[in-house]
Structures are given as C-alpha cells and as structure tokens.
C-alpha cells in the first residue's frame, strides 16, 4: 500500500510526532515531544510504518483509514495518492525528506462543535468546569471526552521545534498545512508566515499553503492573511462546513453560517482552490440532500474557482456514528437520499456494520441540547422529529 503521508508528511500530535494527522501514535516509542523533527522523520517508528504499508499490512496507527477502506470507502491514504500539490516520493525507500508539513499553532477555536473535544479545542475545558454533571455523563455513558479534562491534547510546537523546522525542514518543504484549533485564531500562524518570508534560506514562492479552517475570520489582532498569502506559490483552503444554514449554527455553537459565506467570497481572489468538507455525524444524516444543494449554491458564489465537495465521517463517539442509528431510521434515510458524488460514500457508510448494539444518539442529542441551552426543535427540526418519534 502506498501513502503519501507515510513517505512525505510530518505532523505534531498529542505527545509527539506522527506521519499523519489521523495517525494513532499509541505504539510509537522514539518520537515523543522531547525529540526534534529532524530526529524522528527516519527513526524506527516512522520506518516501521513505511515497511508495514509496503508489505500491505495495516499499521496500528492507521485504524481510521483501515475502517474506511474495509467499508468500501475512500480514505485519507487513498486520497493522498490523488494529491498533486507536492512531488511523488520514492515508495521503495525507507528514508525520506519531508515534503509536506502539518502545523497546529493553537488548540484554541472560536467554535464549540458537537463532535469535537478538549484535545483539539481548549475552550471546552471551561465548559466542562461549568457543567460538571454533564461532563461526567458524557464521559461515563458515551465514552466522550467532549468537555472533559484533555488526556491527549494537541502539542503546539515550541521555539525549539520551530527553530529545527526552519533549519532542517522548511528550506526544502513543498507544502505546509495549517490546522488546529482554528489556524486563523492565533498570531503565531501569521508570525510563522512572516518569518518564512523574511528568511533568505526559504523560497516561499516554491511553497504551497493549505488550510483546514472554519472560515469564521480572516484576520486576528492586527494580522491578516491578505498581505501574507501573495508571497507563496498558491493557497488551498479546506473549509469545514459541518452542515449548512440553521443546522450549521446548531451543530457548531458560536458559529454563524452567513459570516462564513461572506469570508469565502472575500478571500476567494487569493485562493487557488477550495474543498468543502462535511464531517458527517448522525446529526447530519437527516440533511444530506439539503447540504448537497447548499454546497452547489456556495459554488455559484465563487464561479471562477476550482471547488470540490466531499464527506468524511465521525467514528467517535460511537453514539454519533451514522452506522449506529436505528435500522429503520437508516432505511428511511436511504429511501429519501438522492445519491450523487457527494452522498454516495454516505450511503455506503450508512450500510456499514454497527459498532454499538443499542442506539444512543437520542440521549446524546438531549444531553448536548441541555449543555448548549438550545433546542433542535428550532434549528434542526428533523433531529427533533427523530428524537421524539
């Protein structure tokens, strides 16, 4: 099996380094946060992953892609092979040079999304402190650390790591992907771009930038992407649109759908291409036709830009996984679903094997509505109808 991530990519995750942003690094022993990027990219941990993939074996850390591919879906691995933003690696080699770097400059986010947790969003920690009873119930009944103290929070690169990247990785890197948290929600992201522009060892005109963003803001505390992006080869933006319209505002607490649309149109002249991704949970399962039609309307707002749309899926917490809805509910959703390029993988996933014996989504909806003091009756009426059947 080939994977551009395993042979080209470096990511800083909770506790240390990994070859992919989805990789579960539980069995890594030589790639902890005390190491430098240049020390880990060809160590025993990383080489073992490449060797296993070359032998058509799934590394333990690749469980997300394994689940997707065994369900007949595309995966992060298969989609990486379609990525032409950087040159192809030598898949026969165990040692590599990093061409694709992922940086998470903050764990802060200005949204509170229902599928996220404290490991990726520091704002949830205070929410948990303010709601200890709900925090405990989410953890105990759903195995969901939504607002619990983080045990595996994102590690943010410190000065030591950043200096090593500037010395040993960035001068030859071809692509940098910023995620988070929300990447536009920290001065460190903007400062990193400016430092690269100012560094004579780095030719930013040869470096592409990719963002995973909720597109809620374009500037932060005096910094703006508008003056920085023109110095780079090109910019691609993956917009996390987990729902549209009222469903978006309901699922993504503190989000405003119209503001996101305005920002997309405003920044479009600086962007080479957009990818709109709906991280699909049981909340979204009732709205896939509407989401698709709304995505088509967004494409009309930026007609001169290359725009793609796709789904990905929530597996954890299991109660939010679409496969764990009631069987009759899934059958009804499939009956009403218009299958197209956007919804086809959703239909496949919906037919997948259950991972919970008993559905628990209704209970989770009620608990999260209580937590966020909002009712699906007003913003997600199809979810309301479902939980009151």
What are these regions (language model features)?
Residues 226-233, 268, 299:
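Acidic (Asp/Glu)-rich catalytic clusters
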Residues 64-100, 109-111, 131-132:
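Recognition helices and adjacent regulatory flanks at domain boundaries
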Residues 98-108, 117-159, 171-189, 199-221, ...:
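Core AdoMet radical
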Residues 282-298:
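Catalytic cores of alpha/beta
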Residues 1-81, 313-389:
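Accessory C-terminal segments flanking Radical SAM cores
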Residues 188-194, 220-228, 287-291:
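Distinct, well-ordered alpha-helical segments
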Residues 70, 114, 121:
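Short functional micro-motifs and their immediate structural scaffolds
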Residues 43, 86-92, 155-167:
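A Trp-anchored, charged/polar loop motif used as the substrate-binding/catalytic surface
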């Amino acid at each position: 099996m080939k994977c551009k991530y395993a042979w080209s990519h470096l990511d800083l995750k909770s506790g240390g380094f990994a070859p992919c942003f989805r990789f579960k690094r539980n069995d890594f022993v030589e790639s902890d946060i005390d190491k430098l990027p240049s020390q880990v990219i060809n160590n025993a941990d990383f080489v073992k992953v490449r060797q296993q993939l070359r032998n058509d074996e799934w590394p333990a850390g690749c469980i997300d892609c394994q689940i997707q591919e065994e369900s007949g879906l595309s995966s992060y691995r298969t989609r990486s092979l379609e990525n032409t933003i950087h040159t192809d690696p030598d898949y026969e080699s165990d040692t590599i040079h990093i061409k694709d770097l992922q940086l998470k400059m903050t764990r802060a986010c200005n949204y509170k999304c229902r599928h996220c947790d404290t490991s990726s969003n520091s704002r949830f920690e205070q929410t948990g402190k303010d709601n200890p009873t709900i925090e405990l119930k989410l953890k105990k009944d759903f195995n969901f650390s939504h607002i619990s103290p983080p045990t595996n929070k994102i590690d943010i690169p410190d000065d030591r790591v950043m200096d090593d990247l500037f010395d040993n990785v960035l001068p030859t890197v071809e692509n940098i992907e910023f995620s988070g948290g929300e990447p536009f929600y920290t001065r460190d992201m903007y400062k990193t771009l400016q430092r690269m522009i100012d560094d004579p060892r780095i030719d930013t005109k040869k470096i592409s930038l990719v963002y995973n963003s909720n597109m809620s803001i374009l500037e932060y505390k005096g910094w703006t992407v508008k003056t920085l992006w023109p110095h780079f080869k090109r910019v691609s933006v993956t917009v996390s649109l987990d729902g549209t319209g009222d469903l978006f505002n309901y699922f993504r607490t503190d989000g405003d759908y119209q503001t996101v649309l305005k920002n997309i149109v405003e920044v479009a002249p600086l962007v080479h291409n957009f990818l709109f991704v709906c991280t699909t949970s049981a909340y979204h399962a009732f709205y896939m036709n509407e989401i698709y039609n709304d995505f088509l309307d967004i494409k009309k707002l930026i007609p001169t830009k290359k725009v793609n749309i796709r789904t990905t899926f929530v597996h954890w917490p299991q109660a939010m996984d679409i496969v764990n809805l009631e069987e009759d509910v899934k059958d009804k959703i499939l009956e009403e679903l218009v299958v197209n390029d956007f919804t086809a993988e959703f239909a496949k996933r919906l037919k997948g094997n259950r991972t919970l014996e008993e559905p628990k989504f209704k209970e989770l909806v009620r608990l999260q509505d209580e937590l966020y003091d909002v009712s699906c009756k007003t913003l997600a009426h199809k979810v309301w109808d479902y939980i009151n059947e």
